[in-house]
Swiss-Prot record:
Belongs to the glycosyl hydrolase 13 family. It comes from Escherichia coli (strain UTI89 / UPEC). CDD domains: AmyAc_Glg_debranch (cd11326), E_set_GDE_Isoamylase_N (cd02856). This is Glycogen debranching enzyme. Pathway: Glycan degradation; glycogen degradation.
């Protein structure tokens, strides 16, 4: 039997050099590490890793080739109170594996035990890692490097975006390949999108609880192999990486960036009753935040929390991010529950991972977007991330909905959010683009559901409608659910138009949820993470072409307004913005706080957004000059040239002079 050579301690993972494969694994508390390789018949062969450099275990297997399936058995103490849960009866996934063979099914053998170890061997059913070799012709691919001030983000799910698209070949719908299909690229270009932000594509598992209910984790925020692509989105799992890179290359040729939603805050091992896949059995004490009683700090709501204050875990996370940039040419990341990245355990801007990203010549050059909170005390950190990061701006989301749907927000508060929330983000040299403005996202109501439902309807999730937020700031306009009279449909349409206009013509970086431009509904489900079905798949055959055209016109209008594209904070007298009342006069202090919801926003001295958010038709006197309504607002209801606008209830219009 071939013996392992000592090999070398870097890089982490399994790497083929043309003659064999070098294997490395971090574990600070292991006493022994076995590399387990499996032949074509499934027969297991075990090798002790002979090299031990600091906390890195390593070995080199001569004559090993790509396609080899492997895993690890890690020996060490079973001391739950101290956070140690080693169990060599369980085959473990390499945290840096780039391909996985097998499925993560709900099976008792994939659990290590809670108080006492489960010593039943699981190699026969455990997923295996696969050694891969990386050869890919990027041709002349180059990152679009779209300036932040010109960025329009489109948040989408790989499968849900194209699975029902009638113009995309059936055999590739819902896959990575479909993302790069000319039909999809042309659609994104016509819409005006500059960045496609994808929900997680790193391999994830469905929670055992969901599997028992016949459901699955659809969104993908339950990672199990952070370097491996989720195989279900590939036409062929063996070619997933090339399919993904083909799509990125095609999108780049069209000038569209690709941003990945990535989960560095927890793993699919969940709480101590959850499955054992990898980190818990490799070095539980190092990889996770452990309480004094040996249980996990659950700062994510998912059962465990990755310890990104540990230098080795920071190295792992940094290597993961570099992999996606260097190997797949992605243009940036959106970090789920990103406050975890800065925990020491207190949140700090100079936390190790933030510093590593800032000092990395690769990662410091890509777009970085934080979901700036977690569920721990002190977890709400909006505005507090390092300058390299942009952040999801929930202040904008809530303000836009409250202003147009609940009618309870003063003009001053609305204007503050419209102006990139400078009270939150104008610090440490940050620019307006640091505010990622959104009205909706994958998490919550769709835009159509915001105007059709007062209450969530999550019964299909199997939790008796307890899951999902109750703070939706939605308005069904008098009838719960879809459909209704022509008047009801028109009022809902007007509210959608108002929200889209606020999103796409405000200062900051706009993010549009895929399907909102269609009128997509999830029938009131505001937490559709486990709905891999027609509730979440975009139905292109039912898309509202009028709403899509309205959205595209807004995006193209945005690109004509210097005040929105120059990415500079608005200052008094700089000509970027003037805030006027219904008589075209500057608003008084009282009007800002207590005045009627009527406002004129003059941008770049040529573009005017006239707003009447009251219940009555109101005459709005425009500033001096010859004004004409412009697409998508020009039409029968808005005269071509006017000095006075008859503003309908809850209406708005954009003019140019």
């Amino acid at each position: 039997m071939t013996q392992l050579a000592i090999g070398k301690p870097t890089p982490l993972g399994a790497h083929y050099d043309g003659q064999g494969v070098n294997f490395t694994l971090f574990s600070a508390h292991a006493e022994r590490v076995e590399l387990c390789v499996f032949d074509a018949n499934g027969q297991e062969h075990r090798y002790d890793l002979p090299g031990h450099s600091g906390d890195i275990w390593h070995g080199y297997l001569p004559d090993a080739r790509p396609g080899l399936r492997y895993g690890y058995r890690v020996h060490g103490p079973w001391q739950p109170a101290e956070g140690h849960r080693f169990n060599p009866a369980k085959l473990l996934i390499d945290p840096c594996a780039r391909q996985i063979d097998g499925e993560f099914k709900d099976n008792p053998l994939l659990h290590a035990g809670h108080n006492e170890p489960d010593y039943r061997d699981n190699a026969s059913i455990a997923p295996k890692c696969v050694v891969v070799v990386d050869h890919y012709d990027w041709e002349d691919d180059a990152p679009p490097r779209m300036p932040w001030g010109c960025t329009i983000i489109y948040e989408a799910h790989v499968k849900g975006l194209t699975y029902l698209h009638p113009e995309i070949p059936v055999e590739i719908r819902g896959t990575y390949k479909a993302l790069g299909h000319p039909v999809m690229i042309n659609y994104l270009k016509q819409l005006g999108i500059t960045a496609l932000e994808l929900l997680p594509v790193a391999q994830f598992a469905s929670e055992p609880r969901l599997q028992r209910m016949g459901l699955s984790n659809y969104w993908g925020y339950n990672p199990v192999a952070m370097f491996a692509l989720h195989p279900a989105y590939a036409c062929s799992p063996e070619t997933a990486l090339d399919e993904f890179r083909d799509a990125i290359k095609a999108l780049h040729k069209a000038g569209i960036e690709v941003i990945l939603d990535i989960v560095l805050n927890h793993s699919a091992e969940l709480d101590l009753d959850g499955p054992l896949f990898s980190l818990r059995g490799i070095d539980n004490r190092s990889y996770y935040w452990i309480r004094e009683d040996g249980d996990y700090h659950n700062w994510t709501g998912c059962g465990n929390t990755l310890n990104l204050s540990h230098p080795a875990v920071v190295d792992y996370a940094s290597a993961c991010l570099r992999y996606w940039v260097e190997t797949c040419h992605v243009d940036g990341f959106r970090f789920d529950l990103a406050a975890v990245m800065g925990r020491t355990p207190e949140f700090r801007q100079d936390a190790l991972l933030f510093t590593a990203i800032q000092n990395c010549p690769v990662l410091s050059q890509v777009k970085l977007i934080a979901e700036p909170w977690d569920i721990a005390p002190g977890g709400y950190q909006v505005g507090n991330f390092p300058p390299l990061f942009a952040e999801w701006n929930d202040h904008f989301r809530d303000a836009a909905r409250r202003f147009w749907l609940h009618y309870d927000l003063p003009l001053g508060a609305f204007a503050g959010r419209f102006a990139a929330s400078s009270d939150v983000f104008k610090r440490n040299g940050r620019l307006p683009s640091a505010a990622i403005n959104l009205v909706t996202a994958h998490d919550g109501f769709t835009l159509r559901d915001c105007v059709c439902f007062n209450h969530k309807h999550n019964e299909a999730n199997g939790e008796e409608n307890r899951d999902g937020t109750n703070n939706n700031y939605s308005n069904n306009h008098g009838k719960e659910g879809l459909g209704g009279t022509l008047d009801l449909v028109e009022r809902r349409r007007d509210s959608i138009h108002a929200l889209l206009t606020t999103l796409l013509l405000s200062q900051g970086t706009p993010m549009l949820l895929a399907g909102d431009e269609h009128g997509h509904s999830q029938r009131g489900n505001n937490n559709a993470y486990c709905q891999d079905n027609q509730l979440t798949w975009l139905d292109w055959s039912q898309a509202s072409s009028g709403l899509t055209a309205f959205t595209a016109a807004l995006i193209h209008l945005r690109k004509r307004i210097p005040a929105l594209m120059e990415n500079r904070w608005w200052e008094e007298g700089d000509g970027n913005v003037r805030w006027l009342n219904r008589y075209a006069q500057p608003l008084s202090t009282d009007e800002w706080q207590n005045g009627p919801k009527q406002l004129q926003i003059l941008l770049s001295d040529r573009f005017l957004i006239a707003i009447n958010a009251t219940l009555e038709v109101t005459e709005i006197v425009l500033p001096a000059g010859e004004w004409h309504a412009i697409p998508p607002f020009a039409g029968e209801d808005n005269p071509v040239i006017t000095a006075v606008w008859q503003g309908p209830a809850h209406g708005l219009c954009v003019f140019q002079r």
